[in-house]
Amino acid sequence: MIPAIIGTRPNNSIALHKSGIRLLGVDDSPFRRGQQKSFIVGVIMRLDGYIEKVMKAQITIDGNDVTERISNMALKFKDIVRVIVLSGISFGGFNICDIELLFKLTGIPVISLFEKGGSASEMINAINKHLGDQEKIGILKRLKPIALNNNGYTIMANLAGIESESASRIIRMNTVRGKMPEAVRVPDLIAKIL
């Protein structure tokens, strides 16, 4: 078998046939109207779903700090984390993760997954109406979502530093059942109790 390779870091390509590669999955906790802060949960797991580390970081509701917070999580474990998998692009309301900047800061490929039917244009309209933050709008306008098939389900993805074929293979290998991989499902479950 010839392994699929993603060349993301000099002299450190990822052999996707190895179930031991580690992913950092990230999702946010729910929050109530009027709250200033929320949390993101990061889970480091092997491609086969074996969980090795759980962490959290505080983010500002509708702020601009989520890219930095995720980057800090990833850089603490840069020697082992090979792919960052995000549940969506927006955390803590409209705290938008700039996946291209996240890839630049960490050198780690980023896969941002969301349900079919999610729309950046709807987020842009809401941000224009409520926040008027052109930086967030610029990030959203640069996205190029693609459809991926996972276990017969269509899910959407935005990618940085990784090709769609490699992203699709990682998602399939990290999915135990259903349409979403463990790197999205597990942080979501943990974040719900915060």
Swiss-Prot record:
Domain of life: Archaea
Parts forming coiled coils: none
Transmembrane segments: none
PANTHER family in alphabetical order: UPF0215 PROTEIN MJ1150
Family under the similarity heading: Belongs to the UPF0215 family.
Name this protein carries in UniProt: UPF0215 protein TV0037
Organism: Thermoplasma volcanium (strain ATCC 51530 / DSM 4299 / JCM 9571 / NBRC 15438 / GSS1)
